[in-house]
């Protein structure tokens, strides 16, 4: 494992020229005695400003925060937008958001369709439905940026997690967009000139602390002042930004242990051809040690519906911000 200074220097030196992958530190998946294993990535906006001093300030701050919160970097890989696009990593990462953007008109149930029309107060006969990508395909003049601009002319309505809608009328055409923001969201990562930096994190710090105080709220203006997002928000110019908002919140960290399990496989497995079934993530090793069969352990990645403490939800949501051991107990109690 290389020093923090050496790793930061490698990122700064190589990130601008990495079109595919740069494996700076091989990810030590599952190889830890610490209690939590997470996936973190640094988003393209950190590296897009072309200001080496600002990029260095960002790296210095982020790695200092990791040290402050006892979060060990156990793997580091630079990934170019072309690689993310080729392997469809971001499509899988965004899950339901992506599926609805690409196929809403085909996959929505009659019940969901009616809920959309009721929520928006419009008639089905007057307003056909389009996912964001579907609208682009049928309206070739709409780039991701132009569609994003249209989407944000009105406040969207939330049907449920990952499912946002709004009705529009443009040049005499009426229509409903579903997740119309997503093509631009996706393009931000898959644009060939953009890069992210994947970090495998091992830590004994509580998951909730890492999410709330290390990373900070999704909306940087609400983030803890000590957090990475809070620090970016408080002094954007130091890091090369005019301002910092949810649109450029700079970092991602797995929301919970089972989501982290999925993300490790999606990114490290998908991009680096790592067989995560043989190079098992920490949570898989611990599930098997707790008496869960390997088959049952891997079924958890499908995000089944489970019940715990009187709540019935999908496994990822029910274990957000929880440490690995209690999350395993929740899953095991449902088997």
Residue positions per predicted region:
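Non-catalytic terminal and connector segments of soluble metabolic enzymes
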Residues: 1-335
């Amino acid at each position: 494992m290389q020093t923090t200074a050496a790793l930061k220097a490698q990122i700064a030196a190589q990130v601008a020229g990495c079109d595919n992958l740069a494996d700076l530190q091989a990810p030590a998946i599952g190889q830890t005695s610490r209690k939590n294993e997470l996936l973190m990535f640094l988003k393209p906006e950190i590296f897009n400003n072309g200001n080496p001093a600002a990029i260095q300030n960002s790296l210095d701050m982020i790695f200092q925060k990791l040290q402050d919160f006892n979060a060990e970097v156990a793997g580091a890989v630079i990934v170019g937008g072309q690689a993310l696009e080729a392997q469809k990593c971001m499509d899988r990462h965004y899950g339901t958001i992506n599926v609805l953007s690409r196929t809403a008109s085909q996959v929505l149930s009659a019940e969901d369709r009616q809920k959309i029309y009721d929520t928006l107060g419009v008639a089905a006969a007057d307003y056909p439905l389009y996912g964001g990508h579907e609208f682009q395909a049928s309206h070739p003049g709409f780039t991701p940026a132009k569609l994003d601009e249209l989407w944000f002319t009105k406040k969207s309505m939330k049907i449920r997690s990952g499912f946002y809608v709004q009705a529009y009328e443009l040049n005499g055409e009426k229509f409903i967009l579903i997740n119309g923001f997503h093509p631009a969201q996706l393009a931000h990562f898959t644009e060939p000139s953009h890069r992210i930096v994947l970090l495998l994190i091992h830590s004994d710090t509580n998951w909730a602390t890492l999410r709330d105080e290390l990373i900070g709220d999704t909306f940087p203006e609400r983030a803890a002042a000590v957090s990475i997002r809070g620090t970016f928000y408080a002094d954007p110019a130091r890091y090369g930004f005019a301002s910092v908002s949810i649109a450029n919140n700079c970092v991602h960290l797995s929301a919970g242990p089972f989501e982290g399990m999925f993300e490790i496989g999606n990114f490290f497995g998908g991009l680096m051809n790592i067989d995560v079934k043989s190079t098992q993530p920490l949570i898989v090793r611990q599930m098997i040690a707790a008496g869960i069969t390997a088959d049952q352990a891997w079924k958890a990645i499908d995000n089944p519906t489970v019940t715990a403490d009187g709540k019935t939800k999908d496994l990822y949501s029910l274990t957000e911000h929880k440490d690995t051991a209690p999350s395993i107990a929740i899953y095991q109690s449902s088997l």
